[in-house]
UniProtKB/Swiss-Prot annotation:
Residues 3-185 form the YrdC-like domain. It comes from Shewanella sediminis (strain HAW-EB3). It comes from the Bacteria. The gene is tsaC. This is Threonylcarbamoyl-AMP synthase. Keywords: ATP-binding, Cytoplasm, Nucleotide-binding, Nucleotidyltransferase, Transferase, tRNA processing. PROSITE patterns: YRDC. GO terms for cellular component: cytoplasm. GO terms for molecular function: ATP binding; double-stranded RNA binding; L-threonylcarbamoyladenylate synthase; tRNA binding. The keyword Iron does not apply. The keyword Transferase applies. It catalyses: L-threonine + hydrogencarbonate + ATP = L-threonylcarbamoyladenylate + diphosphate + H2O.
Length: 185
């Protein structure tokens, strides 16, 4: 496993790699959202069923537009989202037709977040698009909180580790349905 700086993982991700990186609250695992092979590998590493869906994190809202159907959200709904971004709020939004089921799972919606974490911002800016993001753990286990835990859980299974500080949040992001406004987590 290569320990990398955020600006050094672009090629790894573009070539289908899976990387670990700090987020607002825990370490995450991520890959290219347009590479089904990489997503399948990520799901296998986590032992996570594809039906649950995944989260996309982005450096700005524009990066999410190829994946979400903005036309199905009102200006009022979008404004409630924009007030919370960038930050530790993940919103469930309608998907564009043809989106990979590996991203949205068995749903017709997708969890998305514009992150304020500098590492995620840097990765997504380099990629020019969002990153698949899920907590760095095997399904049912607590998420990794340090580089040491990443190495213990995933050594030899991921392609790069970006070390860095976690954000100030004590728990993973709040998840809100963008249409109903209902808090789901």
């Amino acid at each position: 496993m290569l320990e990398q700086a955020p600006d050094e993982v672009q090629e790894i991700i573009e070539q289908g790699g899976v990387v670990a990186y700090p987020t607002e609250a825990v370490y995450g695992l991520g890959c290219d959202p347009d590479n089904d092979e990489a997503i399948t590998r990520l799901l296998a590493l986590k032992k996570r069923p594809w039906q649950k869906g995944l989260i996309l994190v982005a450096s700005d809202y524009q990066q999410l537009l190829p994946y979400i159907d903005e036309s199905r959200l009102t200006n009022e709904q979008l404004n409630k989202v924009f007030v919370k971004w960038p930050g530790p709020f993940t919103f469930i939004m309608p998907i564009k037709p043809g989106l990979s089921n590996l991203l949205c799972g068995s749903f017709n919606s997708l969890a998305v977040r514009v992150s304020s974490h500098p590492t995620i911002q840097a990765i997504c800016q380099r990629l020019g698009k969002p990153l698949v993001s899920t907590s760095a753990n095997h399904a049912g286990e607590p998420p990794a909180m340090s580089c040491e835990e990443i190495i213990a859980k995933f050594d030899g299974e991921i392609d790069a580790l970006i070390s860095g500080s976690l954000g100030a949040e004590r728990k993973p992001s709040t998840i809100v349905d963008a249409i109903s406004g209902k808090v789901l987590r």
